[in-house]
C-alpha cells in the first residue's frame, strides 16, 4: 500500500511540476510574442511615419511641378503666338525676297548671255592675239639671230682691241725706259762737260806753271853761267855753292818730270772722255731714231683705234635700236596678256558672284523649308502636349505589386512632371536655338554677332550639301574652328539631347520613334545626313550590304557632320551612339513615364551612374513602357519635322555655344553638385582621350550626349567644365566614351577605369550626400533577380569606374559573369570580324548578332559594359525599379554611391528593350546589355530584337517582319555591326588592334572596368531595341520600310551624281589651267 501511495504521490508531483513548467513556457512564449508584436508595431509605425514624410514631400513636389507646368504652358503659349506672328512676317518678307530674287535672276541670266557673247568675242581676240604672238615670236627669233651675229663680231673686235692695248702697253713701257736712259745720258753729258771744264782749268794752270818754271830755268841757266864765271874765280867756295845748286836743280827736274807725267795722264783722260762722249752722242742719236719710229707707230694705232671705236658705236646704236624694238614688242604682248587676264578675271568674278547668289538663294530656300518644317513640328508638338497629359494618367498607373512599387509609381508620376517641366525648359531652349526667326536667335545674333549667323548658314548648307561637302566641311571646321568645334561638339551632343528632349516634350513616349523617323526624314532632306547615322547604317545594311559599305565609306564624314559637324568619324560614331543612347533613353523615359529620375536626374544628369538609377526607377513601369512604345510607333509617322527640328537644333546648338553655355551654367547651378562631378569625370575622360585620341575632347561631348533628355545645356556646361578641367580630371567619363575609331579607346577604357576609381568614389560619396533618390540596385525580385541586381550593381560600378568600391562579392559575381559574357561576346565579335554568320544557327545567329553588337562596342573599348549587362538575367524590372526607388535602407552604400547604369536585361526581349532603352539613355551601355544579356525566351524574339535594333531606321515594321528566323537579316545585322564597328575610323583602329581590344576585354582582370567604357555603344543598340519593342507592340508599317528604301536609293543616286560631278569638275579645272598656261 505504501508503495502504491508513494508512486501516486510521485506521479502527482510530476504532473504538478510539468504543468508548472508548461505554464512558465507558455508565459515566456506569450512574452516573447508580445515583445515581437510590439517591436513589429514600432517598426511599422516608424516605417509609416517615414513613408508619410516621403509622401508629403512628393505631394509638395508634385504641386510645385504643377505650378511650374502652368507657368511653362503660359510661356509656351506666348512664345507660340510670337512665333506665329514672326513667321507670318517672315513669310511675307520671304515672298518679297523671292519676287526680287526672281527679277534679279532674269537680270543675271541676261547678264550671263551678254557675258557669254563677250567671252566669244574675247576668244576670237585670243585667236588673233595668238596668231600675232606667233608672228612676233618668229620676228623675235630672227632678231635674236642677228643679235647673236652682232655679238660674235663685237667679241672679235674686243679681242683685237685687247691685243692692241697689250701692244700699246708694252710700247709705252719701252718708251718709258728709253726716256729714263735718255735722261741718264743727259746727266752723264752734263757731268762730263763739267769735268772737261775742270780739266781745262787745270790744264791752264799747269801750263802757266810750266811757263813760270821755264822762266825760272832760264834764270837758273843765266845764274849758272854767272856762277861758273864766279866759280872759276872762287873755286873753293864756288864748288860748295855748285853742289847746292845741283841739288836744287835735280829737285826742280824731278818736279818737271812729275808735272809732265801728270799732264800726260790728264791728256789720256781727256781723250778717253771725248771717246765716251762720242759713244753717248751716237747712242743718243739711235734712241732718237727709235723714238721717232715709235711715235709713228703710235699715231697709226691711234688712227686704227678711232676707226674701231666708230665701228663699235655704230654697232651699239644698232643693238640699242633692236632692243628697243624688242621691248616694245614685249610690252605690247604683256599688255595683251594683262587685258586678256583682266577679262578672264572679270568673267570669273561675275560667274562666281552669280554662283554665290544662286547658292544664297538655294540656302535661303532651304532655310525657308526648314523653318516651315520647324513650324509644323512646333504645331505638332503643341498638339501632342495635350495627348501627353492624357497619356500620363494612363501610363502612370503602377503595375508593381509591392508597396514600394506603388511608391515608385507615385514618385514616377512626380518625376514625370519634373521631367516634363525640365523637358519643356529644354524644349524652350531648343526652340530658341532652332527658331531662326524667333527672338531667341535675334538675341543670339546680338550676343554672338554675324559670326554665329554665318556658322548657322554654313551648317544649313552643310546639311543640304551633306553628300558633297560634309566630309570636307567637317575637316575644315575642325581645323579652322577647333574651339568652335569643341563647343559645337558639345552643342551637337546637346543638340542630340535637345532632339530627345524636344521629342520628350511633345510626348516622352513618342520621342524615340519620332527622332528615328526624323533622322530618316533628314536623310530625305539632306541627302543622306542621317542616312549615315548608326541607325541609318543599320537601314542601309538591311537594304543592301554592298550599298551600305559604300555609303558608310562615303559618309563617314557625313555621319560626323550630321551628329557632330565638327566631330570626326570616331567622335561621330560616339556622337551617334550618344544620339542612340539619347533616343533610347528618351524612349525609355517616354515609355516609362515613371520618370522617377527627376531628382537623381537633376543631380545625376551628368553622372551616368545616376542616370542608370533614374532609368532603373523608370524600369518600374515596364508595362507602361510597352504602352508608350505603342504610342511611340504611332508617333513614328511624324518623324520628319521633329528630326529636322532636331537637326536644326543641332546646327544652331553648335553655333550657339555661348548661349548653350549660359543655359548649361544655369542648369549646372541647379545640378552643380553632380554636374561638377560629371565634369570631373568627363574632364578625366578627356584627359585620357587626349592621351589616347587626338579628338578626345570631341568624344567627351558624345559621352555627355548620353544624358540628352536631361538637358543639352547642362551637358554643354558639363562639357565646358570637362574641357576646362580636362587637364586635371581625366578619368571618370571614360565610361561613357565610345572611342569608335581609335585603339586609344581601348587604353582609355582601362586607364579611365583605373583613374576613375578615386574620382568616381568621390562622386559616389557625393551622390550619397546629395540625398538624391538614386534608384538603388536593391531588387525585390527572386534570389536570382537579386543576384542579377547585384550583377547590375557591379556592372554599374564597373561603368562608373569604381573597381575598388565594387570589390564585393557582388562585384566579383559581376566580374565572373562579365568575363563569361565578354568571352562569348569576344568570340562572337571575332566571328563578326570574319563575318562567319552562316556558321551560326538561327538562335545562335541572333545571339551572335547581339554579341556582335556588344563585340563591336567592345572593339570600341566598351565591350565590358555590355557584358556586364549580359550578366543580368531577365528579372522583374518593375519590382526592381519600385524597390530601387524607395528601398534606400536595403540598398548598400556602395550601390547608392554607384549611380551606375541600371541596365536590367530581362529574358523577355521587349521588357529588356524597354529597360535597355531607359538605361541606354543614361549610360548608352544597356542596349548592348540587351544584346549581350541572356538569351531571350525565344530565338525568334532574339532575332526580333536584333533585326529591329538594326532596322530602327528601316522601320519597326521591318523588325516585326524579321521576327521570324530570317538568317539574311541577321547576317545583314552582323555585317552592319561589323561595318559600324570598323567604319567609324578605319584608320584609327586596324583589325589587329580590335582583336587586341577583344583580347583585353576577354581578360577577366578588366571586365568591370571595361564595362564602363561601353555605355555609348550600347545606346544605339538600345535605341534599335526600342524600335524593336515598338514594332513588336504594333504591326509593321510596310510604307515605312518602303520610304526608308526610297531614301536609301535617293542617297545612293546623290552619291553617284556627286561622284559623276567630281570628274567633270576636274576636267573643267584642267581646261582652265591649260588655258592659263597657254596665255
From Swiss-Prot:
Domain of life from the UniProt record: Eukaryota
Q: Specify the signal sequence span.
A: none
Q: Which InterPro entries does its entry note?
A: CCDC73
**What is the official name of this protein in its record?**
Coiled-coil domain-containing protein 73
Keyword Cell inner membrane applies: no
Q: Give the residue ranges for region: Disordered.
A: 1052-1079
Coiled coil, from the record:
59-210, 236-384
Task: Give the keywords, sorted.
Answer: Coiled coil
Q: Where is the composition biased (Basic and acidic residues)?
A: 1061-1079
Amino acid at each position: 500500500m505504501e508503495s502504491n501511495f508513494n508512486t501516486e504521490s510521485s506521479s502527482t508531483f510530476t504532473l504538478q511540476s510539468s504543468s508548472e513548467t508548461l505554464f512558465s513556457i507558455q508565459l515566456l512564449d506569450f512574452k516573447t510574442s508580445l515583445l515581437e508584436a510590439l517591436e513589429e508595431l514600432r517598426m511599422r509605425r516608424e516605417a509609416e511615419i517615414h513613408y508619410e514624410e516621403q509622401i508629403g514631400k512628393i505631394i509638395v513636389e508634385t504641386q510645385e511641378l504643377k505650378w511650374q507646368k502652368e507657368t511653362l504652358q503660359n510661356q509656351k503659349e506666348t512664345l507660340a503666338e510670337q512665333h506665329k506672328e514672326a513667321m507670318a512676317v517672315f513669310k511675307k518678307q520671304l515672298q518679297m525676297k523671292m519676287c526680287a530674287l526672281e527679277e534679279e535672276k532674269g537680270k543675271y541670266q541676261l547678264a550671263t548671255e551678254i557675258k557669254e557673247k563677250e567671252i566669244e568675242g574675247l576668244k576670237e581676240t585670243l585667236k588673233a592675239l595668238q596668231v600675232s604672238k606667233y608672228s612676233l615670236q618668229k620676228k623675235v627669233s630672227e632678231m635674236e639671230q642677228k643679235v647673236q651675229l652682232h655679238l660674235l663680231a663685237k667679241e672679235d673686235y674686243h679681242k683685237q682691241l685687247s691685243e692692241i692695248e697689250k701692244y700699246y702697253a708694252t710700247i709705252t713701257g719701252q718708251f718709258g725706259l728709253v726716256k729714263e736712259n735718255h735722261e741718264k745720258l743727259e746727266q752723264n753729258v752734263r757731268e762730263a762737260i763739267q769735268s772737261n771744264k775742270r780739266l781745262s782749268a787745270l790744264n791752264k794752270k799747269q801750263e802757266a806753271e810750266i811757263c813760270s818754271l821755264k822762266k825760272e830755268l832760264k834764270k837758273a841757266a843765266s845764274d849758272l853761267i854767272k856762277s861758273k864765271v864766279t866759280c872759276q874765280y872762287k873755286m873753293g867756295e864756288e864748288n860748295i855753292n855748285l853742289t847746292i845748286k845741283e841739288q836744287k836743280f835735280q829737285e826742280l827736274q824731278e818736279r818737271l818730270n812729275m808735272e809732265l807725267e801728270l799732264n800726260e795722264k790728264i791728256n789720256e783722260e781727256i781723250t778717253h772722255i771725248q771717246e765716251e762722249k762720242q759713244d753717248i752722242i751716237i747712242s743718243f742719236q739711235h734712241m732718237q731714231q727709235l723714238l721717232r719710229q715709235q711715235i709713228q707707230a703710235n699715231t697709226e694705232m691711234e688712227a686704227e683705234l678711232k676707226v674701231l671705236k666708230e665701228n663699235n658705236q655704230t654697232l651699239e646704236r644698232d643693238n640699242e635700236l633692236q632692243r628697243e624694238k624688242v621691248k616694245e614688242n614685249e610690252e605690247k604682248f604683256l599688255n595683251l596678256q594683262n587685258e586678256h587676264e583682266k577679262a578672264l578675271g572679270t568673267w570669273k568674278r561675275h560667274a562666281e558672284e552669280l554662283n554665290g547668289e544662286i547658292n544664297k538663294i538655294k540656302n535661303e530656300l532651304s532655310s525657308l523649308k526648314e523653318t516651315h518644317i520647324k513650324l509644323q513640328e512646333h504645331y505638332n508638338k503643341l498638339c501632342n502636349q495635350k495627348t501627353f497629359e492624357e497619356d500620363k494618367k494612363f501610363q502612370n498607373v503602377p503595375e508593381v505589386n509591392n508597396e514600394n512599387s506603388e511608391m515608385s509609381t507615385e514618385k514616377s508620376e512626380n518625376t514625370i512632371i519634373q521631367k516634363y517641366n525640365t523637358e519643356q525648359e529644354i524644349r524652350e531652349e531648343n526652340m530658341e536655338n532652332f527658331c531662326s526667326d524667333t527672338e531667341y536667335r535675334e538675341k543670339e545674333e546680338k550676343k554672338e554677332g554675324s559670326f554665329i549667323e554665318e556658322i548657322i548658314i554654313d551648317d544649313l548648307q552643310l546639311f543640304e550639301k551633306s553628300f558633297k561637302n560634309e566630309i570636307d566641311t567637317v575637316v575644315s571646321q575642325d581645323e579652322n574652328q577647333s574651339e568652335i568645334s569643341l563647343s559645337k561638339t558639345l552643342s551637337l551632343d546637346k543638340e542630340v539631347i535637345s532632339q530627345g528632349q524636344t521629342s520628350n516634350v511633345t510626348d516622352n513616349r513618342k520621342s524615340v520613334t519620332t527622332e528615328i523617323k526624323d533622322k530618316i526624314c533628314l536623310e530625305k532632306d539632306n541627302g543622306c545626313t542621317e542616312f549615315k547615322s548608326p541607325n541609318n547604317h543599320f537601314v542601309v545594311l538591311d537594304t543592301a550590304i554592298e550599298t551600305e559599305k559604300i555609303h558608310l565609306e562615303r559618309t563617314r564624314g557625313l555621319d560626323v557632320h550630321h551628329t557632330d559637324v565638327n566631330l570626326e568619324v570616331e567622335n561621330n560614331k560616339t556622337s551617334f551612339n550618344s544620339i542612340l543612347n539619347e533616343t533610347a533613353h528618351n524612349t525609355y523615359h517616354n515609355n516609362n513615364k515613371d520618370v522617377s529620375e527627376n531628382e537623381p536626374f537633376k543631380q545625376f544628369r551628368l553622372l551616368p551612374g545616376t542616370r542608370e538609377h533614374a532609368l532603373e526607377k523608370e524600369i518600374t513601369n515596364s508595362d507602361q513602357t510597352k504602352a508608350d512604345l505603342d504610342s511611340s510607333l504611332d508617333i513614328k509617322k511624324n518623324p520628319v519635322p521633329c528630326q529636322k527640328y532636331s537637326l536644326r537644333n543641332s546646327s544652331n546648338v553648335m553655333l550657339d555655344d555661348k548661349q548653350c553655355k549660359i543655359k548649361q551654367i544655369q542648369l549646372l547651378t541647379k545640378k552643380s553638385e553632380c554636374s561638377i562631378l560629371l565634369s570631373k569625370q568627363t574632364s578625366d575622360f578627356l584627359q585620357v582621350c587626349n592621351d589616347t585620341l587626338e579628338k578626345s575632347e570631341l568624344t567627351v561631348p558624345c559621352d555627355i550626349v548620353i544624358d540628352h533628355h536631361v538637358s543639352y545645356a547642362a551637358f554643354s556646361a558639363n562639357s565646358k567644365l570637362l574641357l576646362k578641367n580636362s587637364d586635371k580630371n581625366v578619368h571618370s567619363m571614360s565610361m561613357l566614351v565610345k572611342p569608335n575609331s581609335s585603339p586609344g579607346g581601348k587604353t582609355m577604357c582601362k586607364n579611365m577605369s583605373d583613374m576613375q576609381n578615386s574620382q568616381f568614389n568621390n562622386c559616389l560619396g557625393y551622390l550619397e550626400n546629395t540625398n538624391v533618390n538614386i534608384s538603388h540596385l536593391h531588387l525585390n525580385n527572386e534570389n536570382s533577380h537579386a543576384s542579377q541586381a547585384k550583377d547590375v550593381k557591379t556592372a554599374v560600378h564597373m561603368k562608373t569606374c569604381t573597381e575598388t568600391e565594387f570589390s564585393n562579392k557582388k562585384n566579383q559575381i559581376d566580374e565572373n559573369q562579365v568575363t563569361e559574357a565578354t568571352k562569348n561576346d569576344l568570340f562572337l565579335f571575332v566571328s563578326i570580324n570574319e563575318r562567319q554568320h552562316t556558321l551560326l544557327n538561327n538562335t545562335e545567329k541572333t545571339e551572335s548578332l547581339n554579341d556582335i553588337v556588344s563585340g563591336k562596342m567592345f572593339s570600341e573599348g566598351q565591350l565590358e559594359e555590355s557584358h556586364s549587362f549580359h550578366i543580368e538575367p531577365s528579372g522583374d524590372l518593375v519590382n526592381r525599379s519600385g524597390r530601387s526607388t524607395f528601398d534606400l535602407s536595403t540598398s548598400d552604400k556602395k550601390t547608392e554611391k554607384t549611380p551606375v547604369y541600371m541596365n536590367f536585361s530581362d529574358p523577355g526581349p521587349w521588357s529588356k528593350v524597354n529597360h535597355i532603352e531607359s538605361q541606354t539613355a543614361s549610360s548608352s551601355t544597356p542596349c548592348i546589355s540587351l544584346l549581350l544579356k541572356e538569351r531571350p525566351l525565344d530565338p525568334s524574339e532574339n532575332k526580333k530584337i536584333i533585326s529591329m535594333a538594326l532596322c530602327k531606321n528601316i522601320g519597326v515594321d521591318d523588325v516585326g517582319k524579321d521576327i521570324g528566323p530570317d538568317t539574311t537579316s541577321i547576317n545583314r545585322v552582323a555585317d552592319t555591326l561589323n561595318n559600324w564597328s570598323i567604319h567609324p575610323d578605319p584608320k584609327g583602329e586596324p583589325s589587329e588592334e580590335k582583336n587586341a581590344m577583344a583580347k583585353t576585354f576577354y581578360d577577366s582582370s578588366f571586365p568591370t572596368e571595361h564595362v564602363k567604357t561601353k555605355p555609348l555603344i550600347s545606346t544605339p543598340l538600345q535605341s534599335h531595341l526600342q524600335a524593336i519593342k515598338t514594332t513588336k507592340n504594333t504591326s509593321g508599317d510596310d510604307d515605312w520600310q518602303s520610304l526608308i528604301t526610297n531614301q536609301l536609293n535617293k542617297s545612293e543616286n546623290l552619291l553617284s551624281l556627286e561622284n559623276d560631278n567630281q570628274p567633270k569638275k576636274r576636267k573643267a579645272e584642267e581646261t582652265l589651267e591649260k588655258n592659263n598656261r597657254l596665255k
